[in-house]
């Protein structure tokens, strides 16, 4: 006769425990309600009820697969609580409820991989306890109106500004990447991320309000910032024959950018042939600086 081992399982219809002799070929159906089976590996040597492996709410083996379609409304809220899941659990788990951190992502292994809470429209305090990494900011499912994820502040996940708010964005301390790719730029305020040391040398020009008379007067960026609508090249058909500045060296007007900028020699193009008073006499072209008001040579 084949050797046997002991397996223990619980029954939904009885509080008693059943002890069965299990053959080597494991396993006979030991319970009337397979989904309630709880394997007891400490009491069973080689026999684990097969039905428990496929159980959607098997508490002792709550892996990412158990957190998916099997985790229905009938599944208890404690499902997935003991999971030490991989990052995939954090993004694809349907256990994400309306106003809470996905339970499977509460473990240490998942927090650093962007387990962002799902915001609900009615709760104003949701998402405030997130401690995820910067990677969460780009793909965050948090709605801007709901809250500002705490973990994302250093990487430019700035809350949406209201039109009547003058102090919005004041707490941002983001990296230079936020200045160019931020989808938050609105007319209500200057993104504070462009005032930090990281952003100043990388041309983070603040977004100005249309009604503001001091448009772009405060940036402290590099000359490359001035290649915008603030710059006005001179006319090529002027009788005084001002050289036309190329876009790479656009001279700013007095109301914008840095008033001390001057036209470099590489800006100058040959004078227009339409001009009656200007005809280049040599290879050294006349260059008139719009910023300083003085002639120079290219």
Swiss-Prot record:
Residues 26-271 are annotated as: 25 X 5 AA repeats of C-C-X(3). Restricted to a narrow region of the hair fiber cuticle, lying approximately 20 cell layers above the apex of the dermal papilla of the hair root; not detected in any other tissues. It comes from the Eukaryota. One of its GO terms (cellular component) is keratin filament. The keyword Lyase does not apply. The keyword Repeat applies. InterPro entries: KAP. Sequence repeats lie at residues 26-30, 36-40, 57-61, 79-83, 89-93, 99-103, 104-108, 109-113, 114-118, 119-123, 126-130, 136-140, 146-150, 151-155, 156-160, 168-172, 178-182, 188-192, 193-197, 203-207, 225-229, 230-234, 249-253, 256-260, 267-271. In the hair cortex, hair keratin intermediate filaments are embedded in an interfilamentous matrix, consisting of hair keratin-associated proteins (KRTAP), which are essential for the formation of a rigid and resistant hair shaft through their extensive disulfide bond cross-linking with abundant cysteine residues of hair keratins. The matrix proteins include the high-sulfur and high-glycine-tyrosine keratins. Belongs to the KRTAP type 10 family. This is Keratin-associated protein 10-11. The lineage of its organism: Eukaryota, Metazoa, Chordata, Craniata, Vertebrata. The gene is KRTAP10-11.
